[in-house]
Amino acid sequence: MSSNAQVRRRAVQAARGESPFDLLLIDAQIVDMATGEIRPADVGIVGEMIASVHPRGSREDAHEVRSLAGGYLSPGLMDTHVHLESSHLPPERYAEIVLTQGTTAVFWDPHELANVLGVAGVRYAVDASRHLPLQVMVAAPSSVPSTPGLEMSGADFAGAEMETMLGWPEVRGVAEVMDMHGVLHGSERMQEIVQAGLNSGKLIEGHARGLSGADLQAYLAAGVTSDHELTSADDALEKLRAGLTIEIRGSHPYLLPDIVAALKTLPHLSSQITVCTDDVPPDILLEKGGIIALLNLLIEHGLPAVDALRFATLNAAIRLQRHDLGLIAAGRRADLVVFDSLEKLVAREVYIGGKLLARAGNLLTPIAPAAGVTPPRDTLQIAPLRADDFILRVQGIRHGIARLRHIRGARFTQWGEVEVQVRDGIVQLPAGFSLIWVKHRHGRHQATPQIALLEGWGELRGAIATSYSHDSHNLVVLGRDANDMALAANQLIASGGGMALAQQGEILAHVAMPIAGMLSDLPAAELARQFRELRDLSSQVADWEPPYRVFKAIEGTCLACNAGPHLTDLGLTDGGSRQIVDPLIACREIPEPTDHNNNPQGA
């Protein structure tokens, strides 16, 4: 008899009173996700399994009895879609944080690692998270790259790669299908990817930003079953009515009041509403929380606490096909959270497999890295750069006027056109404009750096550089001064990746991320401190204007699968037409000026 079968047999015996429980939790108020009730009950646990949920005081036979003193007992919280890499922590350090907050299971789309390392990146995700107390369900990334032909990442995934990964038992489905255009227009690659998911019988996650009407229906017809890219309350309702599981995410908090108000108009809240974090940086994760912070926001905006908790427990378990999770019921896994109040959720105690793992925000036992797993390093294949590499030039004209296409906006980008002066072939930056610069870092082609004008970010006072840039994670630098841009970029090349700020010839802040150019090997608290410092100091370089022009927008400046213009390692791209666009519209030569001032690009 297997060990699991033995535990189940012991649980049956304990439930019948034929043998004692291993652990008996008494004086609890059960948050019943099946009925919506809050009711007094005791919970008997055998091994990692709940054996019995029974009236208070009806059983006393247990090897250990622990009183919850009237605390609210909930199933462990679940995050149905997360890019764990956004925490910039390896899996064991990430687990140490979220477990103390009550998150006991996550569905991890490691497409950031996959875009750098290919299948080996997904293998690292599986191996590094296999024996964690956190239940980590890994997905097979479908977006490597997210937009073929418009960008080049470290690998290319199609049907064969998906079949390989979906054959691993630890891989639970197809990660968010971002190439909406390819799905809707029947690209061979996307048909292979989605069909591999359908053949596996596993989940197929969606990314349906902006889809509506016939296109939304077509996207579902292809086999996609969820979406976390909600843009409004109306969008959420349309997708719910269409049959998608909607995943309300915490990374767009400004949408939550309207989404909650819309949900409260419905006569029934179905099981097809879950919650996810998607992306949470380390300082926010440590100081405010992941799923727990999102649930508290939903409650603040008027959603009943039991409904919010159901989204993160029973609904999530149904979505993720984890029928051993999501309920406090006999036969389910004893991953449990104790709250003192449902008005503001704070995890008092966290149990994993029936063992007390965390109390009052503190982990009782450190989590060791997976044995025999070597984190991938040395992934920035770029030689040191010079200031001259960061100059925007116009071919075919020495002195004159050029009309250029450019990127407008920080998050939802639009096309713009502007006339600029050209001196010695170099564009003179207009007032209110900055530069965006991208260079391929995976060693798959030797293309020259791409550079374009950026409007809507103000006049950056220095430079911001990152090797964590959705979704191909090439090296990206924003700025106006070529010397500062080179300084920030070279800092990252030397450290193996990360983020850096430069101003007036000095590095203002730097967070090294030597693991795949996106993860740190620092303790979580120290990484959070460094990241917070970089975020705070970034306001010396950029004038932030929430909700769109924010620090987080740096990471999405090259996300070519979204509508509008974006700059990638292959050039200026258009998300609608799926074309690479020449930024030069027209130019004309004029007599050479007699006044040769220093050019505003800082070279």
Curated annotation (Swiss-Prot):
Disulfide bonds: none annotated. Its cofactor is Mn(2+). Keywords: Hydrolase, Manganese. One of its GO terms (biological process) is adenine catabolic process. Its EC number is 3.5.4.2. HAMAP family: Adenine_deamin. Belongs to the metallo-dependent hydrolases superfamily. Adenine deaminase family. The keyword NAD does not apply. This is Adenine deaminase. GO terms for molecular function: adenine deaminase activity. InterPro entries: Adenine_deam (IPR006679), Adenine_deam_C (IPR026912), Amidohydro-rel (IPR006680), Metal-dep_hydrolase_composite (IPR011059), Metal_Hydrolase (IPR032466). It comes from Klebsiella pneumoniae subsp. pneumoniae (strain ATCC 700721 / MGH 78578).
